[in-house]
Amino acid sequence: MDYSKVSVAESQKLNAAAIKQGKCCVVQGDVSAIPFPNAVFDYVSAFETVYFWPGLKKCFFEVNRVLKNGGTFLICNESDGTNDADEKWTKLIDGMKIYTSDQLIAALKEAGFTEIKTYSNTKNHWISIVATK
């Protein structure tokens, strides 16, 4: 799922064979109102995207809603909110917000996630978070 119609179209082209075989589907949607029923996914991933999610906690509640019990949510960011150089991106890109690990963990806990594990590359300011429903 992607918010961008352009990204969805490109992903559909790139994954045409897998889509035809029924191995995946690519849909346009908004993470604050995920267009899928409750408890349908084992895994949800967010690569370089939570920066742009409107109302982070609400979006995390939505991810939690569509995950099965015991499901996994993976967040990967190349910015961990501790690098002053990242300020250039938030000035250039309207609506972009870079979160620290602590901010993401707090929002995940509020949304009902447990067993939250954080992995970081402090040299490059990268973070990955794995949370279980």
Predicted regions and their residues:
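Class I SAM-dependent methyltransferase SAM/SAH-binding core
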Residues: M1-A33
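Ligand-binding pocket scaffold of soluble enzyme catalytic domains
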Residues: S7-E10, L14, I75, N83, ...
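Conserved Rossmann-like nucleotide-binding pocket used by diverse enzymes
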Residues: V27, S45, L74
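A short acidic, Gly/Pro-enriched loop at the edge of an enzyme's catalytic core
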Residues: S32-V44
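A short SAM/SAH-binding and catalytic strip from SAM-dependent methyltransferases
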Residues: Y43-L56
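Conserved class I S-adenosyl-L-methionine
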Residues: T72-Q103
